[in-house]
Regions:
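Bacterial Sec-dependent N-terminal signal peptides
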Residues: 1-24
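Targeting-peptide/extracellular-domain and disordered-appendage signature
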Residues: 20-107, 113-223
Length: 223
């Protein structure tokens, strides 16, 4: 029998891994990657997620159980049950370019893993510091940055899980998840939107824009 040295075996594994990492295949189960961005004044909010379809399945309370669930893998056990990943595949994430408020509760600028605990009358939204996990298999409460409670709302049928922004104002908007016949809205507010504009105007007044007198007048009128 021909023998292979450990170095040769390791080299073969590395070559195989590199070759596999370069493959781009269609998403399984129609879990299409999606992203939606909304500006609230100067503040950028982005939700990145995978979008599964209903495909004739019963979603709420069955495919997506109510409450916390032991997934039987990773850190998800009976002792440490998991919330829902709020999408499919890897973590759903939400990013804020500046500090904002979610349902009146403050959260700093940054990117967060978004998880949800579904309920028949109330849902809990979890913003986690872990943004690179696969779904909720590695979820631990110690990584929670913020939790807020919201009410689900019945809506028209949506085949694909979708996030969108509605009720948009200059410094606030409602983000919501929609799937099957249910939506989960949560309000995002910029508490200091005018202050951000004033700070931005001060910075612009040190640039070449200051040489146009119309810009100085516009800045003075706003302030």
């Amino acid at each position: 029998m021909k023998k292979f040295s450990p170095i040769m075996l390791l080299a073969g594994i590395l070559v195989s891994s590199i070759a596999w990492s370069q493959m781009t295949l269609p998403p399984s189960g129609n879990n299409q990657k999606s992203e939606v961005t909304q500006y609230l004044g100067l503040v950028k909010v982005t939700i990145a997620y995978s979008s599964p379809d209903v495909a004739g399945r019963e979603i709420w309370g069955k495919l997506v159980p109510y409450g916390l669930t032991s997934l039987g893998f990773g850190k998800s056990t009976e002792q440490n049950p998991s919330p829902w990943r709020a999408g499919a595949n890897e973590n759903t994430t939400i990013s804020f370019s500046h500090p904002v408020e979610i349902e009146g509760k403050s959260i700093q600028a940054g990117t967060y893993g978004l998880h949800m605990i579904p309920g028949t009358e109330e849902w809990t939204l979890i913003f986690s510091s872990n943004t690179s996990a696969w779904g909720s298999y590695s979820y631990v409460p110690a990584e929670d940055v913020l939790r807020v409670a919201v009410k689900p709302v019945a809506c028209e049928f949506n085949e694909y899980l979708t996030y969108e922004f509605i009720d948009r104002l200059q410094n606030s908007a409602t983000a919501r998840l929609k799937w099957e016949k249910l939506s989960v809205p949560f309000r995002i507010t910029v508490p200091n939107g005018d202050e951000l504009y004033i700070q931005n105007l001060r910075e612009e007044m040190t640039s070449q824009k200051v040489f146009a007198w119309q810009n100085a007048v516009a800045a003075a009128n706003f302030c």
